[in-house]
Swiss-Prot record:
UniProt-annotated stretches for the region Disordered: 1-32
Protein species of origin: Scyliorhinus canicula (Small-spotted catshark)
Tissue expression: Testis.
GO biological process: cell differentiation; chromosome condensation; spermatogenesis
Localization terms from the record: Nucleus; Chromosome
Protein name (record): Protamine S4
Length: 32
């Protein structure tokens, strides 16, 4: 998921960026 710190530069992050929840909270941009 996009909330986890270990998610940086992982393929899961790329998927997380496309999720509406992540875009709304801007978590994917900061932590991925």
């Amino acid at each position: 998921g996009c909330k986890k710190r270990k998610a940086r530069k992982r393929p899961k992050c790329k998927k997380a960026r496309k999720r509406p929840k992540c875009k709304r909270r801007k978590v994917a941009k900061k932590k991925c």
